[in-house]
């Protein structure tokens, strides 16, 4: 698999340490780091009404689609190695990625 880039929606096993038994969960690639590492952000279909949750639906995808309306959770960041990624399901629009990235930045700057 080609290394995903920022803005891609990927599927990973969760918990991340056991791909064979983990549930498959979507995540948004926030940054493609040097080497094999990626910074990802959790995506959930559970409703979240906190200051950071960013709504996501199929109209926010420039490529691919999501199964149901969801929320991107910028306060739920984690790093994984590329080999953990099962596959890519799409890519968010530049506008949606910018919206999420601005929320991520406020975690560190505000």
Describe the role of every protein-language-model region.
Residues 1-110:
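Conserved functional hotspots at enzyme active or ligand-binding sites that engage polyanionic ligands
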